[in-house]
C-alpha cells in the first residue's frame, strides 16, 4: 500500500530506483497507490501496478487504511486474488498482498504492533481491540504462514523484527537494515541553535512521557501527520510546538538544529526517526529495546534508557547540561552503515546469487 514514498515504502522504492538506473525493467505492485505516489514512481522509471482495491478508510489516515487493506487479505485473500494475473515477484516487501516470490522482506506483523501500541490509544480503540484481539492474532499467524509458503528466502529489517516472526514459527534467513539517503539527510548547519528538543507524534508515541518532560521546562517541537492519534490536550501545552506534517528539507533543518531528538515509543521494529536524526548530526534519547536499541550506542550517538522515569530524568539532564560536541560527529559517522548504497549492494549480491540480474 503506497500513500507516499516515505517510511516503510523506502526499502522497495530505493532498490527499484537503483535497479532502473542499471537498466532493469521494474514494476511495483500494490493494492492501493495514491495518484501523487503513482506519478512519482513513473517519473523514476518504475512501472506502478495499482490493484485498485476499494477502501472506506481515508487515504490521509494511512494506519487505518493499511489495517483495512490487511483485513481484506487476512480474511478473503482479496488483494492476492487481484494480483494473480501479474508475474511472480522477485521481492515481496508487502504484508498485504502475496504472489510467488524469491524473497520476502519482513517489516513487522500487525498483531504484535497493536498489542504494544494499544495502551496509548483512545478508549474506543481499546474496547474494539479487546473484542477483536483473538481474531487479529489468529489471522496474523495465518497470513505469516501463507507469506512464508509463497517465498523462498525471508529477510527481516532488524533482529527484533526477525524475533517477532520467529514467534509465528517462520524461519528468517538474514537481516538487511532499511536504507537512508544520506544525500538528503545530512547536517544542514555547522552551528545548530540547540534551543529545542525534537520529537515525533504518531500512533507509536508515548505522549505521557513527552508531557512530563515539557512540564519540567523542556522546549519541544513535534512533527507528524497522524493527527487522529494525537492527545489533543498536549497540543495546547505552552512548551510544545506542533509543526504537523513538514517537508523533507524542513525536517532536515529541524533535526539539524535540535539539541537532541526525543523518541519515546511503544513499538518500533526498526525506527527511521533516530536514524534520520543521527544522519543530521543530532543524537537521540530513546529506549534500550527493539529496533532503535540495535543501532543507538549509549553515550556515543545517543542515550538508551530502561524506563519512562529514566527517560524524563535524562531528558531534563541533557537539556540543562548539554553533551560533548563529539557526539554529533559520532552520529554522522555511525549513520554511514545505513547508506542506501550499502543497502543496494547487499540486495545486488542477493539477487546475483539467484541469477535474477
Annotate the PLM regions.
Residues 28-93:
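Active-site donor-binding segments of glycosyltransferases and PAPS-dependent sulfotransferases
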Residues 233, 289-299, 303-304:
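Short acidic/histidine- and often glycine-rich active-site loop of Leloir-type glycosyltransferases
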Residues 322-353:
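A charged, aromatic-enriched C-terminal amphipathic alpha-helix characteristic of glycosyltransferases
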